[in-house]
Curated annotation (Swiss-Prot):
EC class (word): transferase
InterPro entries: Methyltransf_12, SAM-dependent_MTases_sf
Job description of the protein: Methyltransferase; part of the gene cluster that mediates the biosynthesis of aurovertins, fungal polyketides that exhibit potent inhibition of adenosine triphosphate synthase.
SUPFAM superfamilies: S-adenosyl-L-methionine-dependent methyltransferases (SSF53335)
The protein's name: Methyltransferase aurB
Pathway per the UniProt entry: Polyketide biosynthesis
UniProt keywords, alphabetically: Methyltransferase, Transferase
Origin superkingdom: Eukaryota
Length: 230
C-alpha cells in the first residue's frame, strides 16, 4: 500500500471498525486464522519488555499484551513491567496515534518511516520486533518485500526474536468470501499479495537469520526468526 492509499483507507471510521471486521470476522472465517486462538497467543509468547512494533495498526495486539501483563498483578496498585521500552514504527501517523492512545498511559516512542527503506533509528536494539499483518499491504513484489527483513535486522538484539504474520496469495486455498476479499483488497490497493507465497518470505528470512520457524494457518503465514546473521 502506498502512502496515498493509506491516507484514504486508514481513516478514523475505518480504524474504528477494523477490529470487529478483521480481528473478529475476517480472521476467524475467511483467513481461517483465529485472532484469539492463534494470533494473540503468538504475539504474547514472542513479545518482550523491550519491543519494536512495526505497523502498529489499531494497537490491538499491544493492548492484548498490556491487558495480559496487568492480569498477572496481585494488586491494582502494582505497576506492570511491560513495556520497559516500546517503539512504534509506521509510515502512517494516524495509525501510530491510534495505537499509542489505545495503550495509554504507556508512552511509546514513535518513528514515522517506510520500512522498505533504512529506518532512521540509530543505536537501538530490541529483544522483540513484531510485524503483524504488514507485508501483505506493501505495494511491491514478493522479492522486494524481503528488504524489510534486512532493514529490521540491525535493530534486533543477538538473542532477540523477530516475528510476524501475513496473508498469503499463493500456495494456499482461499474460501469463497476470502477469495472475494483478496480480489477486492488487491483491486483497490489495500493489499498487494496475489503473488506472495510462503517461500518468498522464508528465503530472505533465512538469509538474514540463523534460526527461522514458520507455520501456515488457514491462509496466514506465521513466522519467527532468531540469531541475526552478521
Amino acid at each position: 500500500m502506498t502512502k496515498e492509499s493509506a491516507d484514504n483507507y486508514y481513516n478514523p471510521l475505518m480504524l474504528w471498525g477494523y477490529d470487529v471486521f478483521v480481528q473478529v470476522l475476517t480472521n476467524s472465517f475467511w483467513w481461517r486464522c483465529s485472532t484469539k486462538g492463534i494470533l494473540v497467543p503468538f504475539f504474547l509468547d514472542n513479545s518482550t519488555t523491550n519491543h519494536m512494533e512495526v505497523g502498529a495498526g489499531t494497537g490491538y495486539f499491544l493492548r492484548a499484551k498490556l491487558d495480559h501483563e496487568r492480569s498477572k498483578l496481585k494488586s491494582s496498585d502494582d505497576k506492570t513491567l511491560w513495556p520497559q521500552n516500546l517503539t512504534l514504527v509506521d509510515f502512517h501517523e494516524r495509525c501510530m496515534n491510534k495505537a499509542a492512545n489505545r495503550i495509554s498511559p504507556v508512552r511509546p516512542n514513535r518513528v514515522l518511516a517506510n520500512i522498505m527503506e533504512p529506518i532512521p533509528l540509530k543505536g537501538q536494539k530490541f529483544d522483540s520486533i513484531a510485524i503483524m499483518y504488514v507485508l501483505h499491504c506493501i505495494a511491491a513484489t514478493p522479492e522486494a518485500k524481503g528488504r524489510v527483513f534486512a532493514n529490521l535486522k540491525p535493530f534486533l538484539a543477538d538473542e532477540g526474536t523477530l516475528f510476524g504474520s501475513t496473508v498469503l496469495g499463493k500456495g494456499v486455498k482461499h474460501n469463497l468470501i476470502g477469495g472475494f476479499l483478496m480480489w477486492l483488497y488487491n483491486y483497490i490497493g489495500m493489499f498487494d499479495n496475489w503473488d506472495d507465497g510462503k517461500e518468498d518470505f522464508l528465503k530472505p528470512l533465512r538469509e538474514h537469520f540463523e534460526v527461522v520457524e514458520s507455520e501456515v494457518v488457514g491462509t496466514v503465514l506465521l513466522f519467527k526468526a532468531e540469531k541475526p546473521r552478521h
